[in-house]
């Protein structure tokens, strides 16, 4: 059917309608009446995530995929625990119990569902999300330090001191991405490359810029060291060594007494098993498993929503994403 073939392309219903010589309303009606995409079976490795759907059934939709094949397995209208629990509980045990790995962010509802319904699986906390806990902690520290400097500068009677504090605050804002850069993922030449700093009227290497900024505040310097220590663990640790490595980091973070890192320590301790599992090497791919592939699928979902200028009808959105996002799907007429 032409409507289904055209709907597989990443285009709006308005564009699709012009090609077929029908109205947008007619094309949507024909599409909705012609398709009902079945869920794909659960596989050995599944990723679970959410994306902003803003349909009549809820703000966030739940997406389920297979990172090994790149297929979207299903999309649900809600990420609420009771909803996804009921959904998975209605899938036969034989199918659920053959799932070996489940990858997700550190959303407590997901952990509850995995523990109770996927009893043969290993739950993996996605690397990006657990690393982000520390980057967010350091970023809060950076912003708090920057605001502290600006407040002191505003009250200072010493013009030179005020000027210097504003300079540091400006550099913290301008070079925040550099401060968050993972030195264990960058080439050495990246940090040794010189940049011209207008505020200082001179050239500095990226490493010199970092040192100039963090040396202005003891907590900021310690926070930066903690951030890089965590990055090092994420790159060089292993399943066998992780517990020892992260416990050393806990001691380092606790001794720093930086408030912005306290919540991160608590989160890591609560999720230590799932975080450790992120270092497991999958036997078939010989790589660690992540939710990275879902980022591409989430971008696809956003693009389809944008092309449709938003979808209030969840089933319309789901069927369109499933049709565009999968190479092979089962369609119920």
State what each model feature region is.
Residues 26-101, 106-113:
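RNase H-like nuclease fold core
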């Amino acid at each position: 059917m032409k409507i289904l073939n055209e709907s597989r392309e990443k285009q709006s219903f308005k564009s699709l309608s012009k090609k077929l010589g029908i109205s947008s309303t007619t094309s949507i009606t024909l599409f909705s009446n012609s398709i009902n995409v079945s869920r794909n079976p659960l596989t050995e490795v599944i990723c679970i995530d959410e994306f902003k759907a803003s349909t009549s059934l809820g703000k966030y939709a739940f997406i389920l995929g297979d990172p090994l094949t790149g297929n979207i397995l299903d999309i649900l209208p809600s990420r609420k625990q009771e909803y996804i629990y009921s959904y998975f509980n209605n899938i036969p045990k034989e199918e659920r119990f053959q799932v070996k790995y489940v990858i997700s962010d550190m959303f407590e509802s997901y952990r509850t569902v995995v523990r109770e319904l996927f009893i043969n699986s290993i739950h993996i906390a996605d690397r990006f999300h657990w690393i982000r806990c520390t980057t967010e902690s350091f970023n809060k520290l950076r912003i708090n330090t920057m605001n502290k400097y600006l407040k002191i500068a505003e009250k200072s009677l010493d013009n030179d001191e005020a000027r210097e504090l504003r300079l540091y605050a400006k550099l913290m804002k301008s070079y925040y991405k550099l401060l968050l850069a993972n030195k264990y993922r960058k080439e050495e030449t990246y940090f040794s490359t010189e940049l011209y700093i207008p505020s200082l009227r001179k050239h500095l290497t990226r490493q010199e810029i970092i040192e100039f900024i963090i040396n202005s505040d003891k907590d900021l310097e310690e926070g930066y060291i903690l951030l890089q220590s965590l990055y090092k663990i994420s790159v060089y640790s292993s399943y066998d060594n992780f517990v020892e490595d992260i416990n050393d980091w806990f001691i380092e973070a606790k001794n720093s007494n930086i408030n912005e890192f306290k919540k991160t320590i608590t989160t890591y301790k609560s999720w230590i098993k799932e975080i450790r599992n992120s270092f497991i090497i999958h036997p078939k791919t010989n790589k660690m498993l992540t939710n990275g592939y879902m980022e591409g699928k989430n971008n696809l979902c956003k693009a389809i929503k944008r092309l449709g200028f938003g979808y209030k009808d969840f089933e319309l959105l789901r069927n369109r994403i499933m049709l565009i996002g999968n190479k092979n799907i089962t369609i119920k007429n």
